[in-house]
């Protein structure tokens, strides 16, 4: 794995196949626009976490020498190797380097150390579209039209390059500080046979275009039926995303992935009464079970999609110069000082990155003491009353920081459990009727051991190197769980 970035040399050789299946060798070389630099983590000051994935984190990072702020994607080499994700990482890097469009996130440079790979991406200070939907409850039709038009404009370019994104959703639609959309996260991208993107022979997302990737709520029925991927996959996800903008929730939301898939296959979709006729019609067409009938995928291509009545009044030639909708601020930022630099806030345990990154931050902000951290977690955490029944599951000296009745979701079923976060640190889930421990998660000082991903206000996933556990909190406190666990990690 140490040689991974070395393969991203300034010159690449591509072995290609002809469309008729005969093996034809062809050479193609190009220079990377985003170079591999000799930077180290010590060259940056780290701030808040933008997002967490199964093998990566994206964090706000300021380059000390220039003051430039990036969204630094930090990928765990060990996990990438173990989970056979090398090809995905290479392909994302190669694709981002070659895409040039105002609606697509930019890659500036890469570097690596002994434990991690780094991609310095454009920092979108407006956050995720998902956050705007959550803060506003739902978007107005004018807001949804503006954002959808910008996504359509970027998708048209992506598809013209012979690429399928395969993970279009509100979380992957980022907003600039002035409110324009940028499509991000090309970790699931699929080059088509006639793609204009140059790739390495060993940098392909998968050999079979029907391989399941993406996010359950946005997956089209043809993928569930193992049909090859097409541009129509992204258009289905666009329809789901537009529905979510206008309603506040995804169209096929259910208690488990299995139930979501059943609703997708059955096309079990209900339109709220407040949807306009034009919005309802566009979503209905984008969610056609036949991929080739979706607007944008047929013989007329994106011309048919852009002329749909929902987009009446959209100036397609000047999208990026139009005034975007006003962004709803992060409620947490309302209590912060306006002069506060995020780079010095939101302390993040970075001891797993580089050789001794924690040392470099000592001069910037002292980490909170154990008592301070425990106190802040306790204020966040004890959201359900604690009774003596749960004491039997604790070790001597161990205390409960957060506890709640939740559902543990599996593919087909869900089970009620009592989820307990302790100061060990440890997570325990208990069968509340039998008072039997069903499992526990203990993690070390390495924050890569455990990541929390919020998928909706009530749903969250706890990811470890060995497994991913999905939970539903009926009181919609998924973000509270995430904050409590991450605060404990950063103690």
Curated annotation (Swiss-Prot):
Topology term for the membrane: Peripheral membrane protein
Keywords, in A-Z order: ATP-binding, Cytoplasm, Kinase, Membrane, Nucleotide-binding, Phosphoprotein, Serine/threonine-protein kinase, Transferase
Tissue: Ubiquitous.
UniProt GO BP: positive regulation of protein kinase activity; protein autophosphorylation
Effect of residue 167 to A: Abolishes autophosphorylation
Major subcellular site: cytoplasm
Result after altering residue 382 to A: Slightly reduces autophosphorylation
Cellular component terms per the entry's GO annotation: cytoplasm; membrane
Region (PIF-pocket): 75-119
Stretches assigned to the PH domain: 386-491
Residues bearing the modification Phosphoserine: 177, 276, 337, 382
Chain positions recorded as ATP binding sites: 54-56, 73, 122-124, 128, 171, 185
Enzyme Commission no: 2.7.11.1
GO molecular function ontology, one term from the record: phosphatidic acid binding
Catalyzed reaction equations: L-seryl-[protein] + ATP = O-phospho-L-seryl-[protein] + ADP + H(+); L-threonyl-[protein] + ATP = O-phospho-L-threonyl-[protein] + ADP + H(+)
PTM (free text): Phosphorylation on Thr-211 in the activation loop is required for full activity. PDK1 itself can autophosphorylate Thr-211, leading to its own activation.
Residues of the Protein kinase domain: 44-311
InterPro entries: Kinase-like_dom_sf, PDK1-typ_PH, PDPK1, PH-like_dom_sf, Prot_kinase_dom, Ser/Thr_kinase_AS, Ser_Thr_kinase_AGC
Residue numbers spanned by region Disordered: 321-377
Localization, UniProt: Cytoplasm; Membrane
Phosphothreonine: modified positions: 211
Function: May couple lipid signals to the activation-loop phosphorylation of several protein kinases of the so-called AGC kinase family. Interacts via its pleckstrin homology domain with phosphatidic acid, PtdIns3P and PtdIns(3,4)P2 and to a lesser extent with PtdIns(4,5)P2 and PtdIns4P. May play a general role in signaling processes controlling the pathogen/stress response, polar auxin transport and development. Transphosphorylates the AGC protein kinases OXI1/AGC2-1, PK1/S6K1, PK19/S6K2 and PID resulting in their activation.
Oligomeric and partner information: Interacts with AGC1-5 and AGC1-7. Interacts with the C-terminal PIF domain of the protein kinases D6PK/AGC1-1, OXI1/AGC2-1 and PID.
Family indicated by similarity: Belongs to the protein kinase superfamily. AGC Ser/Thr protein kinase family. PDPK1 subfamily.
Domain notes per entry: The PH domain is responsible for the interaction with the 3-phosphoinositides. The activation loop within the kinase domain is the target of phosphorylation. The PIF-binding region in the kinase domain of PDK1 acts as a docking site, enabling it to interact with and enhance the phosphorylation of substrates containing the PIF motif.
Name by which UniProt lists this protein: 3-phosphoinositide-dependent protein kinase 1
Native source organism of the sequence: Arabidopsis thaliana
